[in-house]
């Protein structure tokens, strides 16, 4: 029984990590799209934004199914990736 509880907690925490990451990506995509030089890349960012919105909605559905509020917890991995992306935008903007 204790193992089931631990797995449930791990699942919930992982959902929170993913939810946080997807929400942060949604915030970052407009900045990345604005920094894109080619129309094709801008379009790709818009498409990715649409897909990410679907991911967020699906995650919110999963939270409802398990009876938990849709809430993220800070994910250091996505923070690092987004920081790297900001650096790339600065480098290419020069």
Residue ranges and their predicted role:
Residues 1-94:
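Amphipathic alpha-helical hairpins
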């Amino acid at each position: 029984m204790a193992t089931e509880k631990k797995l449930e907690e791990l699942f919930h925490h992982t959902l929170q990590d993913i939810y946080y990451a997807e929400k942060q990506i949604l915030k970052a995509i407009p900045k990345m799209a604005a920094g894109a030089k080619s129309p094709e890349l801008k379009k790709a960012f818009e498409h990715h934004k649409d897909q990410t919105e679907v991911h967020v909605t699906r995650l919110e559905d999963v939270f409802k199914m398990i009876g938990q509020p849709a809430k993220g917890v800070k994910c250091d991995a996505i923070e690092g990736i987004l920081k790297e992306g900001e650096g790339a935008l600065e480098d290419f903007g020069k």
